[in-house]
Amino acid sequence: MKETKITYKDAGVDIDAGNTFVQMIKPLVKATSRPEVLADIGGFGGLFSLNMGKYKHPVLVSGTDGVGTKLKLAFLADRHDTIGIDLVAMCVNDIIVQGAEPLFFLDYLATAKLDPVKAASIIKGVSEGCVQAGCALIGGETAEMPGFYTGDEYDMAGFAVGVVEREKIIDGSSITVGNRLIGLASSGLHSNGYSLARKVILEHMGLGIDDELPGLGKTVAEELLTPTRIYVRSVMNLLRDFNISGLAHITGGGLLENIPRVLPNGCKAVIKKESWEVPEIFRIMQKAGNIEENEMFRTFNCGIGMVLVVPEKEAEEIMIRLSGLNETAFVIGEVAKCDAGKECVELV
Protein backbone atom coordinates (compact mmCIF):
# COMPACT_ATOMS: atom_id res chain seq x y z
CA MET A 1 0.00 0.00 0.00
CA LYS A 2 1.34 3.40 -1.05
CA GLU A 3 1.83 5.93 1.74
CA THR A 4 0.34 9.41 1.28
CA LYS A 5 2.97 12.13 1.44
CA ILE A 6 1.79 15.30 3.11
CA THR A 7 3.35 18.66 2.30
CA TYR A 8 3.34 22.05 4.00
CA LYS A 9 1.08 23.25 1.17
CA ASP A 10 -1.40 20.49 2.02
CA ALA A 11 -1.51 21.97 5.53
CA GLY A 12 -2.37 25.39 4.11
CA VAL A 13 1.00 27.14 3.85
CA ASP A 14 2.24 27.82 0.32
CA ILE A 15 5.95 28.72 0.36
CA ASP A 16 5.99 29.26 -3.40
CA ALA A 17 3.19 31.82 -3.11
CA GLY A 18 5.24 33.61 -0.47
CA ASN A 19 8.27 33.73 -2.74
CA THR A 20 6.14 35.04 -5.61
CA PHE A 21 4.78 37.76 -3.33
CA VAL A 22 8.28 38.88 -2.29
CA GLN A 23 9.32 39.26 -5.93
CA MET A 24 6.15 41.24 -6.70
CA ILE A 25 6.75 43.80 -3.95
CA LYS A 26 10.48 44.41 -4.49
CA PRO A 27 9.88 47.41 -6.82
CA LEU A 28 7.38 48.83 -4.30
CA VAL A 29 9.92 48.56 -1.51
CA LYS A 30 12.68 50.05 -3.65
CA ALA A 31 10.52 53.12 -4.30
CA THR A 32 10.74 53.98 -0.58
CA SER A 33 14.51 53.64 -0.24
CA ARG A 34 16.75 56.19 1.45
CA PRO A 35 20.56 56.46 1.23
CA GLU A 36 20.87 54.97 4.72
CA VAL A 37 19.30 51.65 3.67
CA LEU A 38 22.04 49.04 3.30
CA ALA A 39 20.21 45.96 2.03
CA ASP A 40 17.24 44.81 -0.01
CA ILE A 41 14.35 42.96 1.58
CA GLY A 42 14.67 39.21 2.02
CA GLY A 43 17.33 39.12 4.70
CA PHE A 44 16.75 38.21 8.32
CA GLY A 45 16.79 41.86 9.35
CA GLY A 46 16.59 45.30 7.80
CA LEU A 47 19.79 47.36 7.79
CA PHE A 48 19.71 51.13 8.25
CA SER A 49 22.85 53.21 8.82
CA LEU A 50 22.21 56.19 11.08
CA ASN A 51 24.47 59.10 10.12
CA MET A 52 25.69 60.04 13.59
CA GLY A 53 27.52 63.07 12.21
CA LYS A 54 24.18 64.82 11.66
CA TYR A 55 23.24 64.71 15.35
CA LYS A 56 24.66 65.76 18.69
CA HIS A 57 22.52 63.53 20.91
CA PRO A 58 20.19 61.47 18.71
CA VAL A 59 17.22 59.76 20.33
CA LEU A 60 15.34 57.01 18.52
CA VAL A 61 11.55 57.19 18.74
CA SER A 62 9.43 54.14 17.92
CA GLY A 63 5.75 53.55 17.38
CA THR A 64 3.50 50.64 16.48
CA ASP A 65 -0.16 50.51 15.49
CA GLY A 66 -2.78 48.90 13.29
CA VAL A 67 -5.87 50.11 11.46
CA GLY A 68 -8.54 48.45 13.58
CA THR A 69 -11.88 47.46 12.12
CA LYS A 70 -11.43 49.70 9.09
CA LEU A 71 -10.12 46.43 7.66
CA LYS A 72 -13.66 45.03 7.78
CA LEU A 73 -14.74 47.65 5.25
CA ALA A 74 -11.77 46.84 3.01
CA PHE A 75 -12.92 43.21 3.06
CA LEU A 76 -16.51 44.17 2.20
CA ALA A 77 -15.43 46.44 -0.65
CA ASP A 78 -12.66 44.07 -1.78
CA ARG A 79 -10.43 47.13 -1.96
CA HIS A 80 -6.97 46.73 -0.52
CA ASP A 81 -4.69 49.28 -2.22
CA THR A 82 -5.06 52.12 0.30
CA ILE A 83 -5.33 50.40 3.67
CA GLY A 84 -1.53 50.29 3.81
CA ILE A 85 -1.43 54.09 3.70
CA ASP A 86 -3.56 54.05 6.85
CA LEU A 87 -1.13 51.67 8.50
CA VAL A 88 1.86 53.91 7.86
CA ALA A 89 -0.07 57.03 8.84
CA MET A 90 -1.10 55.66 12.21
CA CYS A 91 2.52 54.94 13.11
CA VAL A 92 4.38 57.92 11.67
CA ASN A 93 1.80 60.47 12.84
CA ASP A 94 2.35 59.11 16.35
CA ILE A 95 6.11 59.55 16.38
CA ILE A 96 6.19 63.02 14.81
CA VAL A 97 4.31 64.41 17.82
CA GLN A 98 7.56 64.04 19.75
CA GLY A 99 9.47 65.83 17.02
CA ALA A 100 10.93 62.73 15.41
CA GLU A 101 11.67 62.42 11.71
CA PRO A 102 10.48 58.97 10.54
CA LEU A 103 13.42 56.92 9.26
CA PHE A 104 12.14 53.46 8.49
CA PHE A 105 9.06 51.26 8.65
CA LEU A 106 8.28 47.57 8.97
CA ASP A 107 4.97 45.79 8.45
CA TYR A 108 3.32 42.59 9.62
CA LEU A 109 0.62 40.94 7.51
CA ALA A 110 -1.20 37.83 8.70
CA THR A 111 -3.80 35.89 6.72
CA ALA A 112 -5.41 32.47 6.50
CA LYS A 113 -4.30 31.94 2.89
CA LEU A 114 -1.81 34.13 1.06
CA ASP A 115 -3.06 35.64 -2.18
CA PRO A 116 0.09 37.20 -3.71
CA VAL A 117 -1.87 39.68 -5.86
CA LYS A 118 -4.00 40.92 -2.98
CA ALA A 119 -1.04 41.05 -0.61
CA ALA A 120 0.96 43.05 -3.17
CA SER A 121 -1.95 45.48 -3.43
CA ILE A 122 -1.80 45.94 0.34
CA ILE A 123 1.95 46.59 0.24
CA LYS A 124 1.41 49.06 -2.59
CA GLY A 125 -0.45 51.17 -0.04
CA VAL A 126 2.28 50.70 2.55
CA SER A 127 4.84 51.82 -0.02
CA GLU A 128 2.79 54.89 -0.92
CA GLY A 129 2.46 55.77 2.77
CA CYS A 130 6.21 55.46 3.27
CA VAL A 131 6.87 57.70 0.27
CA GLN A 132 4.49 60.31 1.69
CA ALA A 133 6.23 60.08 5.08
CA GLY A 134 9.75 60.02 3.66
CA CYS A 135 10.66 56.80 5.46
CA ALA A 136 12.06 53.57 4.06
CA LEU A 137 10.23 50.26 4.09
CA ILE A 138 13.10 48.00 5.16
CA GLY A 139 11.37 44.77 6.06
CA GLY A 140 8.30 42.94 7.20
CA GLU A 141 6.67 39.63 7.99
CA THR A 142 3.95 37.85 6.05
CA ALA A 143 2.35 35.07 8.08
CA GLU A 144 0.12 32.48 6.44
CA MET A 145 -1.93 31.00 9.29
CA PRO A 146 -4.54 28.47 8.14
CA GLY A 147 -7.32 27.89 10.64
CA PHE A 148 -6.53 31.08 12.52
CA TYR A 149 -8.28 33.66 10.33
CA THR A 150 -11.64 33.35 8.59
CA GLY A 151 -11.91 33.14 4.80
CA ASP A 152 -10.06 35.91 3.00
CA GLU A 153 -9.60 38.12 6.05
CA TYR A 154 -6.23 39.42 7.20
CA ASP A 155 -4.75 41.62 9.91
CA MET A 156 -1.95 44.14 9.80
CA ALA A 157 0.43 45.90 12.15
CA GLY A 158 3.06 48.52 11.45
CA PHE A 159 6.23 49.64 13.18
CA ALA A 160 7.95 53.01 12.64
CA VAL A 161 11.27 54.28 13.95
CA GLY A 162 12.37 57.91 13.83
CA VAL A 163 15.04 60.15 15.27
CA VAL A 164 15.07 63.46 17.13
CA GLU A 165 17.78 65.50 18.84
CA ARG A 166 17.46 65.06 22.60
CA GLU A 167 17.12 68.81 23.23
CA LYS A 168 14.41 69.04 20.56
CA ILE A 169 12.12 66.35 21.94
CA ILE A 170 8.56 67.68 22.13
CA ASP A 171 6.97 66.49 25.36
CA GLY A 172 4.55 69.30 26.20
CA SER A 173 6.65 70.61 29.08
CA SER A 174 6.94 74.06 27.48
CA ILE A 175 3.17 74.48 27.05
CA THR A 176 1.90 77.54 28.91
CA VAL A 177 -1.39 79.32 29.48
CA GLY A 178 -2.20 81.44 26.43
CA ASN A 179 -0.71 79.07 23.86
CA ARG A 180 -2.91 78.69 20.80
CA LEU A 181 -4.29 75.40 19.52
CA ILE A 182 -4.10 74.89 15.77
CA GLY A 183 -6.02 71.99 14.27
CA LEU A 184 -5.00 70.35 11.01
CA ALA A 185 -7.92 69.03 9.00
CA SER A 186 -8.40 65.30 8.74
CA SER A 187 -9.27 63.51 5.50
CA GLY A 188 -12.25 61.82 7.13
CA LEU A 189 -12.53 59.23 9.89
CA HIS A 190 -8.87 58.29 9.45
CA SER A 191 -8.52 54.90 11.21
CA ASN A 192 -10.48 55.26 14.44
CA GLY A 193 -14.07 54.87 15.54
CA TYR A 194 -14.89 52.30 12.87
CA SER A 195 -16.69 49.90 15.17
CA LEU A 196 -19.21 52.64 15.96
CA ALA A 197 -19.26 53.88 12.35
CA ARG A 198 -20.03 50.39 11.04
CA LYS A 199 -22.76 49.92 13.61
CA VAL A 200 -24.45 53.20 12.67
CA ILE A 201 -24.02 53.09 8.89
CA LEU A 202 -24.23 49.38 8.08
CA GLU A 203 -26.60 48.23 10.81
CA HIS A 204 -28.68 51.21 11.94
CA MET A 205 -28.92 52.99 8.56
CA GLY A 206 -28.99 49.68 6.72
CA LEU A 207 -26.59 50.78 3.98
CA GLY A 208 -24.42 48.45 1.95
CA ILE A 209 -20.76 49.06 1.19
CA ASP A 210 -21.57 50.30 -2.35
CA ASP A 211 -24.64 52.36 -1.38
CA GLU A 212 -24.46 56.14 -1.54
CA LEU A 213 -24.36 58.02 1.74
CA PRO A 214 -27.28 60.49 1.84
CA GLY A 215 -26.15 64.03 1.10
CA LEU A 216 -22.51 63.16 0.40
CA GLY A 217 -22.52 61.98 -3.19
CA LYS A 218 -20.10 59.22 -2.21
CA THR A 219 -20.57 55.55 -1.51
CA VAL A 220 -19.93 54.10 1.92
CA ALA A 221 -16.70 52.56 0.61
CA GLU A 222 -15.47 55.78 -0.98
CA GLU A 223 -16.02 57.80 2.18
CA LEU A 224 -14.97 55.34 4.84
CA LEU A 225 -11.94 53.95 3.01
CA THR A 226 -10.44 57.40 2.39
CA PRO A 227 -6.82 57.06 3.56
CA THR A 228 -5.61 58.67 6.78
CA ARG A 229 -3.76 61.93 6.15
CA ILE A 230 -0.01 61.80 6.77
CA TYR A 231 1.23 65.01 8.39
CA VAL A 232 4.96 64.29 8.41
CA ARG A 233 6.23 66.74 5.79
CA SER A 234 4.16 69.65 7.08
CA VAL A 235 5.08 69.10 10.72
CA MET A 236 8.78 68.62 9.92
CA ASN A 237 8.69 71.87 7.95
CA LEU A 238 7.21 73.75 10.90
CA LEU A 239 9.67 72.28 13.38
CA ARG A 240 12.59 73.72 11.42
CA ASP A 241 11.42 77.32 11.80
CA PHE A 242 8.93 77.61 14.65
CA ASN A 243 8.60 76.84 18.34
CA ILE A 244 6.05 74.06 18.63
CA SER A 245 5.20 73.50 22.29
CA GLY A 246 3.13 70.36 21.82
CA LEU A 247 1.52 68.06 19.28
CA ALA A 248 -1.37 65.61 19.60
CA HIS A 249 -2.34 62.99 17.02
CA ILE A 250 -6.13 62.74 17.22
CA THR A 251 -6.79 59.01 17.12
CA GLY A 252 -8.93 56.73 19.30
CA GLY A 253 -10.42 58.87 22.05
CA GLY A 254 -10.80 61.91 19.83
CA LEU A 255 -9.96 65.44 20.91
CA LEU A 256 -11.14 64.82 24.46
CA GLU A 257 -8.73 61.98 25.20
CA ASN A 258 -5.69 62.83 23.07
CA ILE A 259 -5.04 66.51 23.80
CA PRO A 260 -4.67 65.88 27.57
CA ARG A 261 -1.83 63.45 26.82
CA VAL A 262 0.45 66.40 26.00
CA LEU A 263 -0.77 68.99 28.51
CA PRO A 264 1.29 69.69 31.66
CA ASN A 265 -0.37 69.81 35.07
CA GLY A 266 -2.38 72.95 35.65
CA CYS A 267 -3.31 73.42 32.00
CA LYS A 268 -6.46 72.68 30.04
CA ALA A 269 -7.45 73.03 26.40
CA VAL A 270 -10.40 75.28 25.63
CA ILE A 271 -11.81 74.15 22.29
CA LYS A 272 -14.12 76.44 20.32
CA LYS A 273 -16.52 74.08 18.57
CA GLU A 274 -17.58 76.66 15.99
CA SER A 275 -14.01 77.39 14.87
CA TRP A 276 -14.07 74.73 12.16
CA GLU A 277 -16.69 73.07 10.00
CA VAL A 278 -17.19 69.48 11.13
CA PRO A 279 -17.29 67.31 7.95
CA GLU A 280 -20.72 66.07 6.94
CA ILE A 281 -19.93 62.38 7.49
CA PHE A 282 -19.72 63.02 11.23
CA ARG A 283 -23.03 64.92 11.21
CA ILE A 284 -24.68 62.07 9.34
CA MET A 285 -23.49 59.48 11.84
CA GLN A 286 -24.37 61.62 14.84
CA LYS A 287 -27.92 62.16 13.63
CA ALA A 288 -28.52 58.61 12.42
CA GLY A 289 -27.14 57.04 15.58
CA ASN A 290 -28.51 59.66 17.99
CA ILE A 291 -24.99 60.01 19.35
CA GLU A 292 -24.37 62.58 22.07
CA GLU A 293 -21.91 65.36 21.30
CA ASN A 294 -19.49 64.30 24.02
CA GLU A 295 -19.47 60.76 22.64
CA MET A 296 -18.67 62.09 19.17
CA PHE A 297 -15.71 64.10 20.42
CA ARG A 298 -14.25 61.18 22.40
CA THR A 299 -14.71 58.63 19.60
CA PHE A 300 -14.01 60.43 16.32
CA ASN A 301 -11.56 63.12 15.21
CA CYS A 302 -14.56 65.21 14.03
CA GLY A 303 -12.48 66.76 11.26
CA ILE A 304 -9.26 67.49 13.17
CA GLY A 305 -6.47 64.95 12.69
CA MET A 306 -3.58 66.71 14.41
CA VAL A 307 -3.42 69.51 17.00
CA LEU A 308 -0.45 71.85 17.37
CA VAL A 309 0.11 73.83 20.57
CA VAL A 310 2.02 77.00 19.67
CA PRO A 311 3.01 80.34 21.22
CA GLU A 312 0.38 83.02 20.59
CA LYS A 313 2.90 85.33 18.89
CA GLU A 314 3.79 82.66 16.30
CA ALA A 315 0.28 81.40 15.56
CA GLU A 316 -0.41 83.75 12.64
CA GLU A 317 2.86 82.97 10.85
CA ILE A 318 2.34 79.25 11.38
CA MET A 319 -1.12 79.48 9.84
CA ILE A 320 0.35 81.23 6.80
CA ARG A 321 3.03 78.55 6.46
CA LEU A 322 0.45 75.76 6.75
CA SER A 323 -1.59 77.30 3.95
CA GLY A 324 1.51 77.27 1.76
CA LEU A 325 1.97 73.59 2.63
CA ASN A 326 -1.57 72.82 1.41
CA GLU A 327 -2.80 72.04 4.90
CA THR A 328 -6.27 73.15 5.88
CA ALA A 329 -5.78 74.55 9.38
CA PHE A 330 -7.90 76.27 12.02
CA VAL A 331 -7.14 78.07 15.26
CA ILE A 332 -9.47 75.93 17.36
CA GLY A 333 -8.77 77.21 20.86
CA GLU A 334 -6.21 78.02 23.49
CA VAL A 335 -4.54 76.73 26.63
CA ALA A 336 -6.02 77.97 29.90
CA LYS A 337 -5.40 77.41 33.60
CA CYS A 338 -6.96 74.24 34.95
CA ASP A 339 -7.95 73.78 38.58
CA ALA A 340 -7.06 70.48 40.21
CA GLY A 341 -9.62 67.76 39.58
CA LYS A 342 -11.23 69.53 36.63
CA GLU A 343 -11.55 68.26 33.05
CA CYS A 344 -8.49 68.89 30.87
CA VAL A 345 -10.55 69.73 27.78
CA GLU A 346 -13.41 72.22 27.74
CA LEU A 347 -15.71 72.50 24.72
CA VAL A 348 -17.24 75.96 24.32
Curated annotation (Swiss-Prot):
**Which controlled-vocabulary keywords does the entry list?**
ATP-binding, Cytoplasm, Ligase, Nucleotide-binding, Purine biosynthesis
Q: In which pathway does it act?
A: Purine metabolism; IMP biosynthesis via de novo pathway; 5-amino-1-(5-phospho-D-ribosyl)imidazole from N(2)-formyl-N(1)-(5-phospho-D-ribosyl)glycinamide: step 2/2
**Is Nucleotide-binding given among the entry's keywords?**
yes
The EC number of this protein is 6.3.3.1
Q: Which GO terms describe its cellular component?
A: cytosol
Main location (coarse class):
cytoplasm
Q: Where in the cell is it found?
A: Cytoplasm
Kindly report, in one word, the top-level EC class recorded for this enzyme: ligase
Q: InterPro entries of this UniProt entry?
A: PurM-like_C_dom, PurM-like_C_sf, PurM-like_N, PurM-like_N_sf, PurM_cligase
Q: Which GO terms describe its molecular function?
A: ATP binding; phosphoribosylamine-glycine ligase activity; phosphoribosylformylglycinamidine cyclo-ligase activity
Which Gene3D superfamilies does the protein's record reference?
Answer: PurM-like C-terminal domain, PurM-like, N-terminal domain
Catalytic reaction annotation: 2-formamido-N(1)-(5-O-phospho-beta-D-ribosyl)acetamidine + ATP = 5-amino-1-(5-phospho-beta-D-ribosyl)imidazole + ADP + phosphate + H(+)
Q: Name one GO biological process term.
A: 'de novo' IMP biosynthetic process
Q: Which CDD domains match?
A: PurM
Determine if Disulfide bond is one of this entry's keywords.
no
Under the heading Pfam families, the entry gives: AIRS, AIRS_C
Q: Which family does it belong to?
A: Belongs to the AIR synthase family.
Q: Which HAMAP family match?
A: AIRS
> What is the official name of this protein in its record?
Phosphoribosylformylglycinamidine cyclo-ligase
Q: What species is given as this protein's source?
A: Geobacter sp. (strain M21)
Organism classification? Bacteria, Pseudomonadati, Thermodesulfobacteriota, Desulfuromonadia, Geobacterales
Quick one: which gene encodes this? purM
